[in-house]
Amino acid sequence: VWSTEQAQKWGKENPWYCGVNYIPANAINYTAMWDKTSFSPEVIEKEMKLMKSLGMNCARVVMQYAVYEEDPAYFIRTLDRFLSICNKYGVKVMPIFFDDCAFGVNTDPTVGKQPEPLEGWYAWAWSPSPGYSMVVDERTHGKLEKYVKEVMNHFKNDPRIFVWDLYNEPTNTTMPERSWPLLRKVFTWAREVNPKQPITSGLWNGNKE
């Protein structure tokens, strides 16, 4: 755990960050963003260029465990490519490992071609990461530990990443209290890796205490 002095030092050494929760315009969910069938460097580059023109310097983005599980080497290469595009336009990245948000009908993601975005209808086919079934089934958490540690070890000293968000909105939707075991574990795993970057978790409205 960082001391107050470490946190203040990090704050002084870094700029004022201003950015977005990022997902490309061609992706209905984060599975589509990372999947082999739809990852689009062209769209990402266009949007990073736009972000730079607006004075933004950071992007917060959910990584999809299902895509990693299908092909870990592909996922790490793709994340590296995404980071390189962002870096080209001066945009730092806050990757997110897990996410309980499920705005659509699917609470467990599947890889492959995803539904197309619908104009004016946000996230109608959204899916969380890793999916509710794995969150509540602690027998699967060994797989998630491997995912977190492999990705974080690969990028733990990478200056293109400015913060790791370990879990976005734990307990959101139908997950009250059921996310706590995984949330506690992911902080333990991250601290075992001991990345150069700080770690955090984006709280959900109901779990601020």
Model-predicted segments: where are they?
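Active-site mouth of glycoside hydrolases
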Residues: 2-209
